[in-house]
Amino acid sequence: MIALPDTDSEDELPPGWEERATDDGTVCYVNQQGKTSQWTHPRTGRSKRITGELPLGWEKYYDEQGKRFMFLNKETQQRTNVDPRLAFAVEEPTQNVAQVRQRFDSCSTALQVLHGKDLHGRTALITGANCGIGYETARSLAHHGCEIIFACRNRSSAEAAIERIAQERPAARSRCRFAALDLSSLRSVQRFVEEIKQSVSHIDYLILNAGVFALPYTRTVDGLETTFQVSHLSHFYLTLQLETLFDYKTRIIVLSSESHRFANLPVENLAVHHLSPPPEKYWSMMAYNNAKLCNVLFAQELAQRWKQRGISVFSLHPGNMVSSDLSRNYWFYRLLFAIVRPFTKSLQQAAATSIYCATANELTGLSGLYFNNCFFCEPSKLSKSAALQQQLWKLSENLIAELVEQEQH
């Protein structure tokens, strides 16, 4: 049984008040003592709305006089005039980030964040969904009806992940599918996009989850340092190539890390050798830090460029040293991650911020924010440099154009 988050005391109604829902889903507040009603919460001053389909097993019908709606629980035969979705009513979205209240924290799990949500009809594309945080993200969304595209390199691993989800929720099997994507190859990204565009008309959630950590020095088939291409450049290319599948409902989630605060990229004259260094100047930890900074820079610039289209773009930190497959490349980090495991987030907790950014109603209309523990916070000063954001964008565009042209000849 999943433990639900504690009730926010600020959201509790004063004595004598109750919630009711209108036919269009707007929540009103009735003061039984004063015989008055209002559209805003008597304590928070916020308005709410019920959304989505009725919970499983409930149906809505008119009473015998045909004057008001009633609700029937077909399993228990319970009848009530109270809409069961009131328990999951959400605050109307705000354009002011200062008005967003923190509902979850570092202890919250992805499934807690999704409690009461119906995601049937939504489509999520998740890179690296076969293991770790990506798997828990996919699993949680699939449990709530979302269709999942497992964008992974390893077919057998992805299909095994889908099978585990199907064992827990058989109906989810038909909603999950694998599509081959190798982020170390721009050609693979191209083929992946071609396949997706033939089978999908719209993407609601693009979750750029995949990444690498602590790699020995290696180059991709495109000749770039692997950490940089896998963690940033291929995700950059993937996002722009999928642009026609996005609309004002789409949210793009970029997984970064607090490690972005320790990057050493220059603010001026950013060049390829800073991002994809030669072997003699390579340090795996700094390569990771710089790639994570690229993630935030990309998210900030993308949010700015696409803000008129209503597309929301968020970057986030999932948690420190979470026990995932990220540490697989070096024995020291595997040992270190194992030692600190009792003191870090579970994978369900680590996936919570990705899920929150993708689905939270209160984030509608907002973009360009950086999140940690399911709440926005300030990213590094360097990541907020408009000049560096634009330099990285231009460099990424030019680098991809050059590599794609080489591939065609």
From Swiss-Prot:
Its EC number is 1.1.1.-. InterPro entries: NAD(P)-bd_dom_sf, SDR_fam, WW_dom, WW_dom_sf, WWOX_SDR_c-like. Residues 1-23 are annotated as: Disordered. Residues 11-44, 52-86 form the WW domain. GO terms for biological process: apoptotic process; defense response to Gram-negative bacterium; regulation of reactive oxygen species metabolic process; response to ionizing radiation; Wnt signaling pathway. Keywords: Apoptosis, Cytoplasm, Golgi apparatus, Lysosome, Mitochondrion, NADP, Oxidoreductase, Phosphoprotein, Repeat, Wnt signaling pathway. It holds the Pfam family adh_short. NADP(+) binds at residues 128-134. Its main location: cytoplasm. It comes from the Eukaryota. It is found in: Cytoplasm; Mitochondrion; Golgi apparatus; Lysosome. GO terms for cellular component: cytoplasm; Golgi apparatus; lysosome; mitochondrion. The active site is at residue 288. GO terms for molecular function: oxidoreductase activity. Belongs to the short-chain dehydrogenases/reductases (SDR) family. Putative oxidoreductase. May control genotoxic stress-induced cell death. May play a role in TGFB1 signaling and TGFB1-mediated cell death. May also play a role in tumor necrosis factor (TNF)-mediated cell death. May play a role in Wnt signaling. This is WW domain-containing oxidoreductase. The gene is Wwox.
